[in-house]
């Protein structure tokens, strides 16, 4: 089966990074709604933090999480989703797209702080000077990006530190 991903343009990716990643943190849910509207993404009727995206404009495909009105993470697709029958063929094109977006992030934020790859799943984590995490990754069905607030990144690093010191076990 032949399938070609719809891919977010480099310029639009950088525009999203500048608005969501490089601008001041913490961000409020109201900031998230304003950014959603700025980019022209349409919200769910009953969950305004879930909305459409550039590469999947007809489906609710992006979202942000918030606790007590403060954003913890923002998740958006870099590609559309490959149909299930294409998954065996779409892994290599997805990895090419993933590597391309990793190069963009490397130019902006330096080398990835963490990389992982298990079978058809892959992910790289970049950290900005202000402590914002940018994770790009995917599988044979899609490539996506997750932006994590400095607070979420701190919590994750503290958890990893406590596991490494043996104070807590990995599954707690």
Mark where each language-model region is.
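Active-site beta-strand termini and strand-to-loop segments that position acidic
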Residues: 125-130
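Short helix/turn-capping signatures at newly exposed starts of structured segments
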Residues: 1-120, 131-133, 139-172
């Amino acid at each position: 089966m032949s399938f070609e991903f719809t891919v977010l343009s480099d310029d639009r990716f950088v525009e999203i990074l500048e608005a969501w990643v490089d601008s001041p943190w913490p961000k409020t849910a109201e900031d998230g709604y304003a950014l959603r509207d700025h980019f022209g993404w349409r919200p769910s009727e009953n969950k305004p933090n879930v909305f459409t995206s550039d590469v999947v404009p007809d489906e609710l495909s992006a979202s942000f999480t918030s606790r007590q009105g403060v954003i913890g993470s923002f998740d958006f697709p870099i590609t559309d989703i490959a149909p299930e029958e294409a998954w065996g063929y779409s892994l290599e094109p997805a990895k090419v797209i993933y590597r391309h977006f990793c190069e963009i992030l490397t130019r902006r934020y330096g080398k990835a702080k963490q990389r992982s790859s298990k079978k058809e799943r892959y992910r790289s984590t970049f950290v900005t000077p202000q402590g914002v995490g940018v994770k790009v990754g995917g599988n044979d069905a899609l490539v996506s990006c997750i932006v994590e607030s400095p607070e979420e990144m701190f919590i994750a690093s503290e958890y990893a530190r406590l596991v490494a010191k043996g104070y807590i076990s990995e599954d707690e």
